[in-house]
Amino acid sequence: MTETTPKTAPWTVQKRTAVLVLADGTVIEGKGLGATGAVEAEVVFNTALTGYEEILTDPSYAGQIVTFTFPHIGNVGANAEDIEDLTPANRHGAVGAIFKADITAPSNFRAAEDLDSWLKHRGIIALAGIDTRALTALIRERGAQNAVIAHDPNGNFDLDALKARAANWCGLENLDLAKDVTIGQSLVWKELPWTLQDGYGEQDAPQYHVVALDFGVKRNILRLLTGLGAKVTVLPATATAEDVLAHNPDGVFLSNGPGDPAATGEYAVPTIGKLVETGIPLFGICLGHQMLALALGGRTEKMHQGHHGANHPVKDYTTGKVEIVSMNHGFAVDSDSLPENVEETHVSLFDGTNCGLRVVGKPVFSVQHHPEASPGPQDSHYLFRRFINLIRERKGQAPLPESEQAA
């Protein structure tokens, strides 16, 4: 009998097929996934454990590369129902993604394809196999980083050229990205929130009419409005106050979106200022919140690293309660700049930054976080009922209980 010695495959070093090049010249190598090519963007980190498809398709992430701090990715696959941008063909949202581990094979009854294939279809360049904790710590210490992410299956990179691109990119300040992600023409949104029994239904008996200005709106925001009985007419970001009022709305919604609020505000702030004076109930989220503050005489500023995640504690001064919310913003309202007739209603318990405001004596309010998201409990869904109640009050109707869930 011949003895055989068990053989152990030697360690292999995978060839780099993707790189992240920071503006300071730092090069991080790893495995490329998703689309190929190279793109400049701002690198941020997101602390959410779930919802990667919703995160990557959120138009507020336009011009950004998302580092996922949770190590596992791809376990629920991807589908066409969980995207957040209004026009999937235009692929608005994050341009890059960074993962600790390789993509996991999907195991979910709603999965239509694996994450790698989905990234390719969306045109998102991804980098895996790096120390995301170290990158997150770097961003925490130095701030959000301008960078280039590149993917070449052959591993051929001109690092000097990529370093130059990263160093010369202008960054998000002074960039109006809302014009790139907004719809081209108006539309009426009727889709209702998803249920296990029926999927997405359709609103067929609206009680109110809300006009939404689309600076990069998420689908689930619109669904929660229709779920409360609203017909929602969505208008492009460049719509004027006259355009909005021509639809005779019961309420006006200012959506989330990407980029610098001061840049988008060049055309949006005058519109918002006129709408505030009409007495029509007005509700803003994220970028809409920031531009409302500008219209009221406040200021906004670029944040060091921004807030991106689903575990952010926010205090609502109007109720005294603390909510765990989803956030995605790199600019913030300067609380000290708000005029006397504007009250701060919400504040971040992480760093004390402004997260909400209301105008004294007017049916106008806004929040920085995303109340449509549900990181566990639906802590902030009451804000949609608060908006609808302002509409009902103007119509002489009794208010809905805020404590009930909106979806």
From Swiss-Prot:
Keywords from the UniProt entry: Amino-acid biosynthesis, Arginine biosynthesis, ATP-binding, Glutamine amidotransferase, Ligase, Nucleotide-binding, Pyrimidine biosynthesis
One GO BP annotation of this record: 'de novo' pyrimidine nucleobase biosynthetic process
InterPro entries, per database record: Anth_synth/Amidotransfase, CarbamoylP_synth_ssu, CarbamoylP_synth_ssu_N, CarbP_synth_ssu_N_sf, Class_I_gatase-like, CPSase_GATase1, GATASE
Region CPSase, residue ranges: 1-205
Record's catalysed reaction(s): hydrogencarbonate + L-glutamine + 2 ATP + H2O = carbamoyl phosphate + L-glutamate + 2 ADP + phosphate + 2 H(+)
EC number per UniProt: 6.3.5.5
Pfam entry (one): CPSase_sm_chain
Positions annotated to bind L-glutamine: S60, G257, G259, L287, Q290, N328, G330, F331
A GO term for molecular function: glutaminase activity
Known pathway: Amino-acid biosynthesis; L-arginine biosynthesis; carbamoyl phosphate from bicarbonate: step 1/1; Pyrimidine metabolism; UMP biosynthesis via de novo pathway; (S)-dihydroorotate from bicarbonate: step 1/3
Residue ranges constituting the Glutamine amidotransferase type-1 domain according to the UniProt record: 209-397
Quaternary structure note: Composed of two chains; the small (or glutamine) chain promotes the hydrolysis of glutamine to ammonia, which is used by the large (or ammonia) chain to synthesize carbamoyl phosphate. Tetramer of heterodimers (alpha,beta)4.
Family: Belongs to the CarA family.
Described purpose of this protein according to its UniProt entry: Small subunit of the glutamine-dependent carbamoyl phosphate synthetase (CPSase). CPSase catalyzes the formation of carbamoyl phosphate from the ammonia moiety of glutamine, carbonate, and phosphate donated by ATP, constituting the first step of 2 biosynthetic pathways, one leading to arginine and/or urea and the other to pyrimidine nucleotides. The small subunit (glutamine amidotransferase) binds and cleaves glutamine to supply the large subunit with the substrate ammonia.
UniProt cross-references to PANTHER family, sorted A to Z: CARBAMOYL-PHOSPHATE SYNTHASE SMALL CHAIN, MULTIFUNCTIONAL TRYPTOPHAN BIOSYNTHESIS PROTEIN-RELATED
Protein name in the entry: Carbamoyl phosphate synthase small chain
Organism for this UniProt entry: Brucella suis (strain ATCC 23445 / NCTC 10510)
